[in-house]
Amino acid sequence: MLFRSDTELCFSYTPLDTSLIFNASLLAAESLALAHRLTGDGDLKILVEKSLRYVINRQKADGGWDYGTRWRHRWMDNFHTAYILLSIHRLKNYGLNVNLPIEKCLVHGIDFWIDNFFLDDGTPKYFPESVHPVDIHSAAAAIGAAMELSTFDKRGEKIGRNVLRWTIRNMMDEEGFFYYQISKKGKIKTPFMRWGQAWMAHALAAYLECDKGGA
């Protein structure tokens, strides 16, 4: 871990990394929460609670989060916001019984995400203030997160369905792969395996698992 106080902590990507990145720290917290569920180790629960508190306490007044704490990381995008919300949602469902305003944080965060990162037709924006570039990773993360979050906020199912429809119509090649980006100048059709194809496969699986209304 990189930052630690009596009440908070933040995990780093690696032992050598010095950046404080919110979604990365929460991924570590998810792993510890699962280990706590399996072992009942109370020390793990304390670590999870402190790391969750760190992120909740840094939620901005509008409901969003910067990517990280350094000045060069003080921007927001669609998929990192989705990652943060999803981790908080999963940690809530672990039933850790921690004294934190998790539901209030989720409500505020989901409101911000829905209001700032999607157009009415399902286009996934990259930044709150800019649609372009429309990125396949933004689309995939949004679909998966929205469908999973729909158990907490029913709007998630509609968001996930709308983004999926838009993505298939606008970013799926007739050969079956998904394009990398749509910029203001046009489509970048490179089929990146991890960034695009793997994440869209995950998104499609999440959609099929959660969908109740049909595409």
Segments from the language model and where they lie:
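Glycan-recognition and catalytic cores of secretory/periplasmic carbohydrate-active enzymes
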Residues: 1-215
